[in-house]
Amino acid sequence: MKHYNTKKLNREKDSWLYEISNSIVEPKKLLKFLHLEKYPKYYDSKPKKVFPFRVPYSFASRMKKNDPKDPLLLQVITKNQEFLNNLQFNEDPVKEKKDIVLPGLLHKYKDRVLWILKTNCAINCRYCFRKHFPYEKNKGNKKNWIQILHYISQNIELNEVILSGGDPLMAKDHELLWLITSLSKIKHIKRLRIHTRLPIVIPNRITSDLCQIFSNSVLKIIIVTHINHPQEINEQLSDSLLKLKKSNVILLNQSVLLKNINDNAIILAELSSRLCENNIIPYYLHILDKVKGTSHFLVSNKKAKSIISDLMKMISGFLVPRLVFDNGSKDNKLIII
């Protein structure tokens, strides 16, 4: 990965790039940072050869020291369980490959497309459902972007574009300005939805320039954050989320239900409360997509339903996310509750 000269970086604009370039890329280094050198049984470095290991320090700093069961650590640490063979788990659990119409563009639903804007992330979560996605054939470059814009302009039934990845906010501000300006010239496009985890792990990604881009856009901008545990929300993130709110951005959140991480109603109630405090609507709670190497994260449908049932007794209805599952064979996500 390219390392940036910090003397040349604009402190406000580019500090997030510095954080990415200086991320922790070795499991042992993260364990040392957390004073967990004596717990080698809790990780296996081999899985990082299949799916790279990457954790920014700003996210690692929210993990509890001396706690091998920290819920943030468990989302990112490599384990030999990733090599467990389970026939129910495969490399394309939501059957996305069949929906690729152009390099980087998926057209599954009639009125919207999903754009793989960038192929990398600031953090590599071990449960990621795209850990085996064919990114090499779907790279985010200007040539592909121009083809995608043409496709969108020619399909007038579309009214929404979803930016995904990787993480779409890995694109720099000037790239996003060009893209959003280009989309705003297509009259039938009304909404731009951005699915991202980057501001959660590196809050500095929400720059003043980015907020200005969102604020000036004629498109309705919706950002879907990926927050799984209340411990992920700190003061710095709250400040960045407030900037987005002031930029007329609609904020939603989706979480993944993860075994031994957030699979109880008390944690999810606290998460929904913290989200509400930060102007985010709890949107979806996903049953784990059965991607190869993630079976140790799976929470059964029966337990998931029980958790939601308990959650509904604890908090206001609007704070209860919809429990959903996507197996790729339906025209939409299956809403369980």
UniProtKB/Swiss-Prot annotation:
Record-listed N6-(pyridoxal phosphate)lysine modification sites: K333
Cofactor: [4Fe-4S] cluster; pyridoxal 5'-phosphate
Domain Radical SAM core: 107-322
Principal EC category: isomerase
Regions crossing the membrane: none
Assigned EC number: 5.4.3.-
GO molecular function: 4 iron, 4 sulfur cluster binding; isomerase activity; metal ion binding
Cofactor comment text: Binds 1 [4Fe-4S] cluster. The cluster is coordinated with 3 cysteines and an exchangeable S-adenosyl-L-methionine.
Entry annotated with the keyword Zinc: no
Keywords, ordered alphabetically: 4Fe-4S, Iron, Iron-sulfur, Isomerase, Metal-binding, Pyridoxal phosphate, S-adenosyl-L-methionine
Catalytic reactions of this protein: L-lysine = D-beta-lysine
Residues reported in the UniProt entry to bind [4Fe-4S] cluster: C121, C125, C128
Function: With EpmA is involved in the beta-lysylation step of the post-translational modification of translation elongation factor P (EF-P) on 'Lys-34'. EpmB appears to act before EpmA. Displays lysine 2,3-aminomutase activity, producing (R)-beta-lysine from (S)-alpha-lysine (L-lysine).
Family stated for the protein in its record: Belongs to the radical SAM superfamily. KamA family.
Protein name stated in the entry: L-lysine 2,3-aminomutase
Gene name in the database record: epmB
